[in-house]
Structures are given as structure tokens and as C-alpha cells.
Amino acid sequence: DRAGLKGVAVLFAILPRPLVKVVLSLAANANRLPGWLAPPFRELNLGVKGVVMSLYYSDVTMDRKIHGAVGFDTKIAGETDGSSVEEAYAKLRAAQAGLRSMTVRDRVAFIRRLRESILARQEWIIDQIQEATGKSRTDALTSEIFGTLDHLLFLEKSAEKHLREKKVPTPPVLMGKKSVVRYEPLGTVLVISPWNYPFYQAIVPITSAFVCGNTVAYKPSEYTPLLGVVETVLADAGFNEGWVRVFYGAGEVGSKLIDQKPGKIFFTGSTATGKKIMAQASRELTPVELELGGKDPMVVFADANLDRAVAGAAWGALTNTGQSCTSVEKIIVEDSIFDDFRDRLVKEVGRLKLGVDKDGGADIGIMTNDMQTSIVAAHLEDAEKKGAKVLHGAGWDRKSRAVPPLVFDGVTRDMKVYREESFGPVLPLIRFKSEEEAIEIANDSEYGLSASVWSKDLVRA
């Protein structure tokens, strides 16, 4: 921060030049220092490189504010040019040879240190997440921190077991031979993450690729880049700067990264962007893993526990303000209990507190960006125009990112809120009279991501 930068500047001003060189040399080699001495020099190394070369060791630039590096808003001219991307990729490929030769156990040691770093810095990380996304503190803690730590603990406990060489049966035609399954790194993996879970969707795929022996090119969303956060925890854990490189920027930067022929692309985001990535990757037959959009149905039968179902609908639709690919977006309720369920749901969402908090007092955060807010507004206006009743949230001004839960009754199939992904705090209610009709409504979608059935009859569910 600014105070730390001033302190370093004063220190360097009063120290003799030879001693300054010694300090900078120690900072550059912080990973080789004893455990008690390494952290402050890692911080210094990261800070110096952050100021001089942007926030992670390559000429990655974007026309957005920088808060953490120098304590004031500034701009970096332009986005990453092709030569910078090529140079950074060359360094990733060069570093991969050394990473590949490490044992899984050695890589897991870095995972353990990373988990410890995140635990130590969790309050600061949550602050950065809230500033970037507008999440409630509870959402930031449970979905971003808890989930990430859980994943890292899994890698610590299970990576060696899952990645060790395994003997498998040999077919009779190869009698006399031995067969084994051996897991080999892919090389450099490109991770492109979404704006809705910027920390979790960074650390989880980065570490999954790393523990398998891959270097990682990571591009966060331009909406929630979390400038310097990922770099800080990785450096704190002792990650070599050549193992993971962060590239800031918009879609053009992602396209340049794909052109570098990564070993694999892991993308989470919209269906439209996923199609573009797959089309570009197909030119080189680059393997892709895509996690895209959804219009996830929740089917509630008459024999369901209504209190639990109502709580489940509110949680499923409003966690992360509905900005999740697996959010409940179609609530399909059996006709005989529809009115009771609807009234309970309106009462449930009406007691929830909306806002960005610092003490865990808010139940729902605000929308992350104006782009997605405008989509929710368009869905609301379309539903009202076509006859839907807004039972909660009708007073929203259609502009503020503080969007209240929007409960719809009278939803029909021609409405956007029925067909398109809203990715916001929407709760469209739809009646059904038979099991067959419920299944048909649930499957009446171009998406196929997640769904839930609420009933005491496990056979039917």
C-alpha cells in the first residue's frame, strides 16, 4: 500500500547503495531464504515488481483502476501486445520442464503453504472480493474462502494417491506385457475465469493444474480482476514466478493467449463466450473444458417439506445475488400447494437484508456490474409487459445494482425470465399439475446444468 511504499522509499534513500543492492538481491531470491526470513523479502520482491512491471511480472495492462499497488488510481496504457504474451508464454514453457521434474509430494508442499497463506490473509482477501464484486461478507467467506480452502485440503490429502502410477490388467492379446496408467502434465494450461467467483475460480483451477505439473497462464475477468490478490498469496507460498503468470485485460487478451497453443484451456463463463473460445481452440485442436450457463429448475411436489423447500428456493436463487451458473432460476411448484408456497416464499425473501456489509449483517449483496444488472432489468420489464405479477421487488428502479429479490407469478413460456439465463436475484414461479408436466417444464430449456427435485418420495425424485 502507499504507506509501505513510502517506508521502502525512505529506507532505500538512507541506506548506502551497496546495501540497497544486497536487500534487493535478497528480495529477488526470497524463496531460497529460511522460513522465518523469507516472508518480508517476498513482500518486498512482489511490491517492487508490482510497481515497476505491473502486478505480476509481465507487461499485462488494462484501462482500469489500480488500488493496492501504489495507493492511488492510475492507468496503464493499452492492453498486452502480442509480443508480451509470446514472451510470457515462452517463460512459462521454459519453467514447466523444472516443474514437471518435481515430485507430486514437493508440489503438494506448495499447496499446503498456499492454504496457510490464504488462512492468514482471509480478512484482507474478503475485503478485496467485496470491493470488486459487491458480495455480502457471508457470501464472500462461504463461497470463496471456504470452498477454496476445502479444495486445497483435498489436494493435500489426495493428490499423491490420484496421480501415482497405477497397474492395470493387460488384455490377453498382449500376454506377457505389463500395463500401467501414468499421468503426464499437459504443459501450460490456460485458465480464463469468470467475474462472479473471482478468487475461488482462480485458485482452484490454477492449483489443480499446478499439482499435476503444469505451468499456468491465468486471465481473470476484466470486471473483477482482484488486482494483485492471486499474485500475493502465490508469492507468499513461495511459488516460482515462472509457474503462474497473470494476464489482465478484456477478451482480446484472452484471444491472444489462446493463439499461443496452450496444452489445455479451462474456461468458466457465459455460453456465448464459451462458443467463441471453442471455435478458436478448434483451429489447433486444443483441448477445452467449458463450464457455461444454466437455467436451473427446482421442482417442488405437494408432499415436500414446505419450510425446507421455501428456504431452499431462497438460498438457491439468491446466493451470490443469483449470479451463479447453478442458481435456481425456475421454481416449478405443484398446483395444490402453489399458493401456500408462493406466500411463504414472498415472506421469506422479504425479511432478507440487502447490501454490502463488513460485519456479516447482510444476507444478499449487490449485483457485480451494470451489464448484468441491465439484463435483469430487461427480464423484469419483459415479464411485466407480458402479464407477470411481481410479488416482491417491484419498487426497484431498474438501474441500481442493489437489486431486491424479484418474485414472479403468472410466468409464461414466452417470457425472457422463463427462457433466458437471468443471472440475478430472480424467482419465477410456475405451476404444474402432473409429474409429466413438471418434467416437461424443467426440460424446456436450451441449458442443461443442474436441477433439484423436492419430495419425500425418493423413488419419484
Language-model region placement:
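Residues at or immediately preceding the N-termini of alpha-helices
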Residues: 82-85, 104, 122, 306, ...
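ALDH superfamily catalytic-core signature
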Residues: 76, 238, 272-412, 441
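Mature-region segments of soluble proteins
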Residues: 2-72
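Short, well-ordered beta-strand elements within core beta-sheets of diverse protein domains
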Residues: 77, 94-101, 191, 298-300, ...
